[in-house]
Amino acid sequence: MAGKKKLLAELREKSTDELDAFIHENKKALFSLRAEVGLQNKAVKTHLFSMYKKNIARSMTVKQEKEGKIDG
């Protein structure tokens, strides 16, 4: 829980370009994990899938907050 709040605080401090770079890095990492699964690599850490997906979702939410697209 503390890690989630720390990550959100760090994401809110970043600029839009930095958020885009963070999203891109996480998408690349997620893609490489999927490629490893496709190659049937037995050493794939499956918990990383949800971690990367959640990081992407959180950063996109922060990006939308900055752009004022979230009703609240």
From Swiss-Prot:
Keywords for the protein's UniProt record, in alphabetical order: Ribonucleoprotein, Ribosomal protein
Example of a GO cellular component annotation carried by this entry: cytosolic large ribosomal subunit
Keyword set includes DNA damage: no
Keyword Ribosomal protein: yes
Classification via InterPro entries: Ribosomal_protein_uL29, Ribosomal_uL29, Ribosomal_uL29_sf
Protein origin, superkingdom: Bacteria
GO molecular function ontology, one term from the record: structural constituent of ribosome
Entry's Gene Ontology BP terms: translation
Sequence similarity: Belongs to the universal ribosomal protein uL29 family.
Protein name, as recorded: Large ribosomal subunit protein uL29
Organism of derivation: Chlamydia felis (strain Fe/C-56) (Chlamydophila felis)
